[in-house]
Every structure is written in structure tokens, then in C-alpha cells.
Amino acid sequence: MSKLYEWIIPESDVLDKEEVQVKPPAMYKVVLNNDDYTPMDFVIEVLQKFFSMDMEKATQLMLNVHYEGKAICGTFTAEVAETKVAQVMMHARENEHPLLCTMEKA
């Protein structure tokens, strides 16, 4: 008969546990920029649809864009920020608005 614990790896074959430092991902701000042509209602719609804002928050941010020239819609990882910018830009173009959405390193 074979021994029950024959399969145990000799201690000399075990690797030491290595400490791994995990950095948080780089974050990016998604920014809406003001223009003189995109209707305010459309900007509110964009903020509700793509950034899950309620009417009050979307209206406040739209006013910030209007009066300050731009406003941050949120901060996300690079991939999420890129996707949100692309979605907003595509939606604006489909509706024939020149709304500009960009991303900046946070």
C-alpha cells in the first residue's frame, strides 16, 4: 500500500510568498463644455441618460456648464471615461448638436 501523504511537496520546493503592491487605476474627469447652440434641455437629458443624474442635479450641472464654461460630470477609470465621452458625443451628433464632451486626468 502507498502512504497517505506521499504527494506532499517537499518544503524545499515551495516558493516564498511575494508581496505584490497593487496601485489604484488612474482616474479621469469627464467634462461637458459649453457652446452657444446646444439646448439646455438636451444637456439635462444627456446628464440624466449617461450619468444617472436626477432632474435637480442635472439642471444644476447644466447651469454650471452654461455659466462657468464647463463642468465635471464625474470621475471614472480611463475605460469608463472613454466610453462615456464616446456615448455623449455620438448622442449629440445623432441629434445634430455640437456639444463637446472631453476627459482630463484627475
Swiss-Prot record:
Which BP terms from GO are recorded? Answer: protein catabolic process; proteolysis
* Pfam families given in the database record: ClpS
Q: Spell out the NCBIfam families in the cross-references.
A: PRK00033.1-3, PRK00033.1-5
Q: What is this protein's function per UniProt? A: Involved in the modulation of the specificity of the ClpAP-mediated ATP-dependent protein degradation.
Subunit-structure text? Binds to the N-terminal domain of the chaperone ClpA.
The UniProt family comment states: Belongs to the ClpS family.
What is the name listed in the Swiss-Prot or TrEMBL entry for this protein? ATP-dependent Clp protease adapter protein ClpS
